[in-house]
């Protein structure tokens, strides 16, 4: 087996980043996280930083907005994984420029980890965020940088604890709001599993210049099926309140940030079916559970047990 690629994370202490960094370290990859000096002493990040230290993660001092520090950090590694948040998506052009100058990167994973932005029917404000991600894809391709785009669909930890009920702090016990007719299938993946699959793809020639879709069959489920599964677990039938698409579109326009973003992404997935309304063609994509059948992923059924 060839030696494992060295991986640099940019945005590694963020929401999804920390899971992928952990998966990288646990799989024995030499793992580097770009951090600003201030982040190392930030109380809000102390738990994540301590966990990284315990896992043997290396910290590289630098900044997305300091070109020289970025180039220097990238020159030390083989693979760059960006997990920057919503507000920094457009700034990934700076990573592309640094990768280009460094000239040694075997693979770049831009910050994706959601819907496939090239196959989207999203309305605003999600539309603009997806367009920003798509522009980054085009820039990566135009520069001839080897890539993998990870389309991991929904984070289980974000949507399942409340069954996607806006403003709720726990899963519903009496009534549940369902967007649209509840029939399009969506996909929910546990964040740790997203980390595992992403890291498996790093040195895999089958994922080179492809979209890696994470579509576990057991986690591909319509909203109606999700509610039925939850009802079975709590031994209770919920009142289902369906919100027609027309009403949902109006709600999106009237909502403030961040609710309008959440609702517009929910509309794309639960009404338009953007997780599952296309076939994965070998010309552009591969599917994670097919490539890595040995990975035991957490199913939606298992995941919901903790909330009963």
From Swiss-Prot:
Binding, NADP(+): 11-17, 36, 45, 137
* Reactions that this protein is recorded to catalyse: (-)-dehydrodiconiferyl alcohol + NADPH + H(+) = (S)-isodihydrodehydrodiconiferyl alcohol + NADP(+); (+)-dehydrodiconiferyl alcohol + NADPH + H(+) = (R)-isodihydrodehydrodiconiferyl alcohol + NADP(+)
Keyword list (alphabetical) reads: Allergen, NADP, Oxidoreductase
Q: Name one Pfam family in it.
A: NmrA
The source's domain of life comes to Eukaryota
Q: Explain the purpose of this protein.
A: Oxidoreductase involved in lignan biosynthesis. Catalyzes the NADPH-dependent reduction of phenylcoumaran benzylic ethers. Converts dehydrodiconiferyl alcohol (DDC) to isodihydrodehydrodiconiferyl alcohol (IDDDC).
- Tell me what this protein is called: Phenylcoumaran benzylic ether reductase Pyrc5
Q: Which organism is it from?
A: Pyrus communis (Pear)
Q: Which gene encodes it?
A: PYRC5
């Amino acid at each position: 087996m060839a030696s494992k690629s060295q991986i640099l994370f940019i945005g590694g202490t963020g929401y999804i980043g920390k899971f992928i960094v952990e998966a990288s370290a646990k799989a024995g990859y030499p793992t580097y996280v770009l951090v600003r000096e201030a982040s190392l002493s930030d109380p809000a990040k102390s738990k994540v930083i301590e966990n990284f230290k315990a896992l043997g993660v290396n910290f590289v001092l630098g900044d997305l907005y300091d070109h020289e520090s970025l180039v220097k950090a990238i020159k030390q590694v083989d693979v760059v994984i960006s997990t920057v948040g919503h507000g920094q998506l457009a700034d990934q052009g700076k990573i592309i420029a640094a990768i280009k100058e460094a000239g040694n990167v075997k693979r770049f994973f831009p910050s994706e980890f959601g819907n496939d932005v090239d196959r989207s029917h999203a309305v605003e404000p999600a539309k603009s965020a997806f367009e920003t991600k798509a522009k980054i894809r085009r820039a990566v391709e135009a520069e001839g940088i080897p890539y993998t785009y990870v389309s991991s669909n929904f984070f289980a930890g974000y949507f399942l604890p409340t069954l996607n009920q806006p403003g709720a702090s726990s899963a519903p016990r009496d009534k549940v709001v369902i967007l649209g007719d509840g029939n399009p299938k969506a996909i929910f993946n546990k964040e740790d599993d997203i980390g595992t699959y992403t890291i498996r793809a790093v040195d895999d020639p089958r994922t080179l210049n492809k979209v890696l879709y994470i579509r576990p069959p057991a986690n591909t489920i319509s909203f109606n099926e999700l509610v039925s599964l939850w009802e079975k677990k709590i031994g209770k039938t919920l009142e289902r309140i369906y919100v027609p698409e027309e009403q949902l579109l109006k709600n999106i326009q009237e909502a403030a940030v961040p609710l309008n973003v959440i609702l517009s992404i929910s509309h794309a997935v639960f009404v338009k079916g953007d997780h599952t309304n296309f076939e994965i063609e070998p010309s552009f994509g591969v599917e994670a559970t097919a490539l890595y059948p040995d990975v035991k992923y957490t199913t939606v059924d298992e995941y919901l047990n903790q909330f009963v």
